[in-house]
Amino acid sequence: MATEMKRISVLKNIKTSKTAIINLCKYGDVKAVSKEKTIFPFTNDVASEVEIHAKLLTKNLSPKILDSDAALHSIIFEYLEGSNDLINYDELFLTKLGKAIKKLHLMDFNDIGAESFQQKINTYRQIFVDSDDSTILAGFELFDRLYDSPNNLVFCHNDINASNIFYTNDIKLIDWEYAGANLPIYDIASIIKSLKLDEDQTKILLDSYDIKLDVTKIKSFEL
């Protein structure tokens, strides 16, 4: 990737959060999306995100990175045509989503350097080591209970919600800031909770995902 990014012109702000400023822009003559990351201790850095996207691009699961600059904490992505403003999650959408998540979870991730979900939680612990906030402490207790034997880890997005899903003929996911090794049920539970799927919709998702999970634990992971 380039060390000096081609001049970009910002068209409008898409989202500003505690972890990034995301803008619709022109990259040269190409419509694109720019992300300027803030320094946040438990999100993937620019180098890790570039590595993740390169891997996922071969699976058609993410947008292509056009340019990046680690020193500026900036990444330029291709602009995705499609929608992430879906109202009705019909059978076709849920089937494609389940298959996309299955493809993600079956991917070999041993060559990806992103921290695991457990490592990110341990960073939280260090930051809040002296905290007596009951909500924070309850979160750590829940994590320890659910992850008492973290085997069968897969590569997870770890932040799947409606705004991170782009849908045209295929499903692509954006915002891989929290991605890393985790229990597969975490992604599934995140989808069910964030999309507010009912029992029938959940069955369609799980049938298309088609990897055995202990569905009785899904509610516990809807954090």
Where are these regions (language model features)?
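Active-site activation/catalytic loop segments of kinase-like enzymes and analogous catalytic loops
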Residues: 185-213, 223
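ATP-binding pocket architecture of kinase catalytic cores
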Residues: 18-115
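An alpha-helical support segment within catalytic cores of ATP-dependent transferases
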Residues: 1-2, 109-158, 207
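Active-site acidic catalytic loop and adjacent metal/ATP-binding pocket
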Residues: 18, 22-25, 143-186
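A short linear hydrophobic-aromatic micro-motif
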Residues: 9-12, 62-66, 215-218
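ATP-binding glycine-rich phosphate-binding loop
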Residues: 3-27
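Structured catalytic cores of enzymes that bind and process phosphorylated ligands/cofactors
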Residues: 64-66, 104-124, 153-156, 165, ...
